[in-house]
Amino acid sequence: MSSSPLTTAVLTALRALGGIATSAELQLRLKASQPTVSRALAPLLQAGTVRKVGAARSQRYVLPRHIPGVGGEVPVMRVDTQGQASPFGRLLPLQGGGIWAEETDGVRELHDGLPWFLNDMRPQGFMGRTFAHKHPELQLGADPRHWSDDDVLKAMALFGDDLPGNLVVGEAALQRFHTLPARASKVASPADYAELAEQAMRGTLPGSSAGGEQPKFCTQVDGRHVIVKFSPAGTSHVDQRTRDLLVCEHLALQTLAAAGLPAARTRIHAVAGRTFLEAERFDRTALGRIGMV
């Protein structure tokens, strides 16, 4: 694409405006008429250097940004309670660092970084570090707290097939989602939790990235999707206190449920010197998923 002084000026103006602008904003910035700005945008749009987003009065022009390993446009799928995936929307990373999100229900928004509906999905806590350990090819560092929004989006788009909630980000993650039933952790009974705890402490257990610092793992038992916190296997006072706290958490949740308040269904298991607090996941069904915010 050959550039004219005006097309160059349009690109400069878009960069100065954070990678996104309306036609009126470009006209004001360039002191040019609407037809003149439209003519300058035409070759940029044809080449894909500039993208047009939104509709009618909310239409804007954006400078797309390519994220290595992710691309310049990221589809987002939503998994229903039966395990079927359907389009939720798309994400367009912008040169100014923001992300333009378009949902299939018509919502179109500019976000300064990662959209709010993805925040609870980001790998974090104990299982976030397990996620990072499991995927060294991401080359993002061992602690997800230090990841940038681009890093998080890359992790989601490449390996986010089993994250909390019901969204799957990116084509690669969607392809992994379709093979997840064959890879997901499953056990015959809670008696197998001791081995899963050992695997989790070694950072080798497949499973989704639930937040929090308490050691935990996700698995399926008796057809139920569960998240399981576990204590150390030692005999010190600290180890015993951790076991007691897990029992207290179980009793507290039972008390809430007895009072008619929403609470996770939990069970306590003692296996191989450890105490396990098993909680049924509220973002999973037998076959599919449930959204969460």
Regions found by a protein language model. Give the residues of each.
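Phosphate/dinucleotide-binding and metal-coordinating scaffold of catalytic cores
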Residues: 2-8, 16-293
